[in-house]
């Protein structure tokens, strides 16, 4: 199920980013240090009580040279489009401004739940400032202080009351769910249409979330598939074109609901920084990943072109060295027949389990070949390893001291596991724990 999305909307200088940071706390930092992966701070996952959700900070958009009201309108329209619930942020010290009223007009037309927050109410004596904000027409204003963090609990309680009871469509265990992500104009929509165009049995279009995302179900050679959020792939609005950061959020929600993620690259344009960011989202989410190079028909090539392009991909995506690469053309259907079998292989690997006794034979052989590291005269001892989860495959190594497990040795063990069992297309997690 996809987590709901909460957007913080308001004119500049009302404290959106401060409240964003208050709510997400430490969560904005990258959990694992992966080379080449950066996280855009315009959104983050957050939790309140037992509710997980995504939080958007519209204050994260660069103002640039655009007129102020145009920028405000863009912020609000983007949030309206993506959010399940909107926090309308105002500044109690300034009172209701013309810009606040402009935002309110847009939000009233949205039919989305809106919770009104009045920021900078830094002490009880200032509480009377909130009453003017009833005039905006969104019911009770919630007084908060970004500086002190007060009032956020009541605000988030009000937000959580609007969360959808059902976040999305549930599918049977034997259905492989995959999505296509990539920057604009890499050919995601064309690939979706090319995949579906070859199908003889399209089962249904199922509304996949609370809004306009559509999941397309189909069957190929007895295997059930769902392409997650095909509506999102086909939708192109002026707002998204001008603020591409926000298309990230739609990709995140699709990734969250998928088993396998197809990261689509444009062979004509090569690889840019945005491609690396987008691919990083799939890796960080622990999904199976396939790198799909589209528009391969449009590239002038010789017998070395594919090898050289593949080397560039490996150089740019060192954190995805486990992901297979497929060169295709949605236009000419080149190699498209290989795509779904590869999706199925990666999905199977993503859910693969290995027997503990066989796993430990591999680990002991690895240690014999490359002895464990030492630190300050102490040597790492690996007593045994076991697989504790799938999707992605996750292994726990019981050791004498987890601090002695250097990341380079962990990587060595991962490579030995891959050599023994495959796991093509899926990340692997290894966790060192002390033996009790």
From Swiss-Prot:
Taking every annotated instance into account, which residue ranges of this chain make up the domain KH-like?
Answer: 352-436
Q: What is the name attached to this protein's record?
A: GTPase Der
- So which domain of life are we looking at? Bacteria
Instruction: State whether keyword Cell wall biogenesis/degradation applies.
Output: no
Q: Where does GTP 1 bind?
A: 10-17, 57-61, 119-122
| Protein residues bound to GTP 2 | 182-189, 229-233, 294-297
Sorted alphabetically, which keywords does the UniProt record give?
A: GTP-binding, Nucleotide-binding, Repeat, Ribosome biogenesis
Query: What does the record note on quaternary structure?
Result: Associates with the 50S ribosomal subunit.
Describe its function: GTPase that plays an essential role in the late steps of ribosome biogenesis.
Q: Source gene?
A: der
Family the entry assigns? Belongs to the TRAFAC class TrmE-Era-EngA-EngB-Septin-like GTPase superfamily. EngA (Der) GTPase family.
Q: In this protein, which residues make up the domain named EngA-type G? A: 4-167, 176-351
Please provide, alphabetically and separated by semicolons, the GO molecular function terms listed in this UniProt record: GTP binding; ribosome binding
Q: Which GO terms describe its biological process?
A: ribosome biogenesis
User: Which HAMAP family does the record cross-reference, listed alphabetically?
Assistant: GTPase_Der (MF_00195)
């Amino acid at each position: 199920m996809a987590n709901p999305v909460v957007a913080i909307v308001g004119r500049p200088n009302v404290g959106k980013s401060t409240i964003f940071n208050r709510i997400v706390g430490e969560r904005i930092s990258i959990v694992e240090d992966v080379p080449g992966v950066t996280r855009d701070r315009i959104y983050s996952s957050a939790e309140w009580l037992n509710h997980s959700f995504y939080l958007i900070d519209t204050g994260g958009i660069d103002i640039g040279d655009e007129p102020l009201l145009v920028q405000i309108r863009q912020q609000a329209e983007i949030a309206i489009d993506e959010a399940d619930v909107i926090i309308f942020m105002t500044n109690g010290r300034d009172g209701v401004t013309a810009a606040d009223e402009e935002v309110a007009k847009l939000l009233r037309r949205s039919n989305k739940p809106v919770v009104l927050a009045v920021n900078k109410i830094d002490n009880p004596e200032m509480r009377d400032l909130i009453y003017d904000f009833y005039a905006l027409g969104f019911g009770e204003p919630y007084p908060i202080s970004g500086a002190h963090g007060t009032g956020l609990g009541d605000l988030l309680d009000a937000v959580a009351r609007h969360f959808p009871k059902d976040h999305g469509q549930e599918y049977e265990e034997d259905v492989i769910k995959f999505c296509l992500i990539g920057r604009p104009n890499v050919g995601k929509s064309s690939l979706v249409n090319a995949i579906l165009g070859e199908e003889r049995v399209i089962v249904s279009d199922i509304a996949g979330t609370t809004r306009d995302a559509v999941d397309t179900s189909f069957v190929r050679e007895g295997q059930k598939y769902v392409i997650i959020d095909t509506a999102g792939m086909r939708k192109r609005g002026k707002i998204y074109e001008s603020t591409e950061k926000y298309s990230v959020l739609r990709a995140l929600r699709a990734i969250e609901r998928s088993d396998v993620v197809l990261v689509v690259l444009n062979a004509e344009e090569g690889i840019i920084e945005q491609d690396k960011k987008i691919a990083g989202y799939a890796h960080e989410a622990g999904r199976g990943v396939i790198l799909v190079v589209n528009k391969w028909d449009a590239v002038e090539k010789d017998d070395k072109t594919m090898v050289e392009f593949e080397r560039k991909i490996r150089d740019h995506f060192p954190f995805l060295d486990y992901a297979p690469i497929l060169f295709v053309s949605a236009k000419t259907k080149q190699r498209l027949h290989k795509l779904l079998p590869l999706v199925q292989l990666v999905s199977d690997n993503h859910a693969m389990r290995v027997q503990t006794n066989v796993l430990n034979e591999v680990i002991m052989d690895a240690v014999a070949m490359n002895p464990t590291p030492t630190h300050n005269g102490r040597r790492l001892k690996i007593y045994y390893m076991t697989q504790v989860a799938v999707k992605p495959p996750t292994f726990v190594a019981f050791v004498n001291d987890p601090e002695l497990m250097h990341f380079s040795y962990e990587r060595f063990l991962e490579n030995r596991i891959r050599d023994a069992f495959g796991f093509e297309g899926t990340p692997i997690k290894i966790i060192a724990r002390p033996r009790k």
